[in-house]
Amino acid sequence: MKLDAPFNLDPNVKVRTRFAPSPTGYLHVGGARTALYSWLYAKHNNGEFVLRIEDTDLERSTPEATAAIIEGMEWLNLPWEHGPYYQTKRFDRYNQVIDEMIEQGLAYRCYCTKEHLDELRHTQEQNKEKPRYDRHCLHDHNHSPDEPHVVRFKNPTEGSVVFDDAVRGRIEISNSELDDLIIRRTDGSPTYNFCVVVDDWDMGITHVVRGEDHINNTPRQINILKAIGAPIPTYAHVSMINGDDGQKLSKRHGAVSVMQYRDDGYLPEALINYLVRLGWGHGDQEIFSREEMINYFELDHVSKSASAFNTEKLQWLNQHYIRELPPEYVAKHLEWHYKDQGIDTSNGPALTEIVTMLAERCKTLKEMARSSRYFFEEFETFDEAAAKKHFKGNAAEALAKVKEKLTALSSWDLHSIHEAIEQTAAELEVGMGKVGMPLRVAVTGSGQSPSMDVTLVGIGRDRVLARIQRAIDFIHAQNA
């Protein structure tokens, strides 16, 4: 049989990996980690990375899911050299190989009815035998190819399938455990396990990195590859990701979609760094640049054990990257969250200033956008607990005094503002907090913000003075 590559197979490329998701839902973190490991291994070996969309499940595959997968890959910045390729667009190729296999006696048509197969399975179960097809149609020449049928792969009946998994070591499965796999359905569509084999062959895939739930598919796929004379790639089956309760990660553990993490305020660098460490390590190092990941990544350092997802660790990493990445870069991601929360940032400080002010305080960009609304728009009410705590005693007097001094400033800068607050406290013979905290609630609506001088510079003179007066009026109204 002849290879039919959908792209030029460069003979100088010694490693070519692929990520092959099924578009039946979003890109989840398990799939993202698999894609990352596959991508890193290709980059580590100066190889190529292929994106393939395995959409043979016509009932469950959707264009929306495909778009979500591609969006997730792009957000994570995992570019591919070839693709995306769609299995539904390669049905002619799969059927061509199946027809050749039938001609060469490597596969055969099966006309058995559902009733016959159900009866066979029932008999085998009664006899405590492993359910498997009995090859009733292997030498049946009494039917026409035009009659409804499936096509089965003629699996070897003797010996074993042995392969050296790059993560798990030697795996051996007896051929007696394997059935004659259906490779083409009655409707003429090829099945998943067969399409994968032809694609890996045609696309020159040298290393298949995928989840451990595919281990049972591997011997079947290897036997088909051997039958058609195709090279056998190296397989690496990575373990599952569990929640912190030890159960398989699912929706009940919170966000499992890659783009949900984007929506929740995580930077792609943080998620990538977290995912690479979720089953792989390089000494005790926790923080990895992308270049370091590429330089250090090896499949034989991937753990065989399941990993537990820890949101607190991810938040720690996210805050690290918020602090350490260039403010201009973080601000671009932050801008998305302002828009998502309906906050108009056209009238206020530069977003890079927001990042600089709040990097030490916020674990996520969503939190950063939410907690900095007051820089860009008016708030409707004061936080009830903060107002009750700080709008009492001589708060109105302190606010009036500090407003007077702020109004008189010739320059609206950090030093001048700090001096005005300090002088107010000195003249009233109170601690800085007796002025600073009522002022904070007055201008932000809450009891939390960066230092007052930084906050006031960011909000701007006119807004600050108007908000102080509003707070004074509020206090008087409460005391009336």
Swiss-Prot record:
Keywords linked to the UniProt accession: Aminoacyl-tRNA synthetase, ATP-binding, Cytoplasm, Ligase, Metal-binding, Nucleotide-binding, Protein biosynthesis, Zinc
Cofactor: Zn(2+)
Location of the protein in the cell: Cytoplasm
Domain of life: Bacteria
Cofactor info, note text: Binds 1 zinc ion per subunit.
Motif window: 'HIGH' region: 21-31
Annotated GO CC locations: cytosol
GO biological process: glutamyl-tRNA aminoacylation
Catalysis: reaction(s): tRNA(Glu) + L-glutamate + ATP = L-glutamyl-tRNA(Glu) + AMP + diphosphate
Single GO molecular function: ATP binding
Extent of motif 'KMSKS' region: 248-252
Chain residues that bind Zn(2+): 110, 112, 137, 139
The EC number(s) this enzyme carries: 6.1.1.17
Residues holding ATP: 251
Alphabetical list of InterPro entries matching this protein: aa-tRNA-synth_I_cd-bd, aa-tRNA-synth_I_codon-bd_sub2, aa-tRNA-synth_I_CS, aa_tRNA-synth_I_cd-bd_sf, Glu-tRNA-ligase_bac/mito, Glu/Gln-tRNA-synth, Glu/Gln-tRNA-synth_Ib_cat-dom, GluQ/Sye
Enzyme class name: ligase
HAMAP family: Glu_tRNA_synth_type1 (MF_00022)
Family in the record: Belongs to the class-I aminoacyl-tRNA synthetase family. Glutamate--tRNA ligase type 1 subfamily.
Function noted in UniProt: Catalyzes the attachment of glutamate to tRNA(Glu) in a two-step reaction: glutamate is first activated by ATP to form Glu-AMP and then transferred to the acceptor end of tRNA(Glu).
Protein name: Glutamate--tRNA ligase
UniProt source species: Haemophilus influenzae (strain PittGG)
Organism placement in taxonomy: Bacteria, Pseudomonadati, Pseudomonadota, Gammaproteobacteria, Pasteurellales
Gene for this chain: gltX
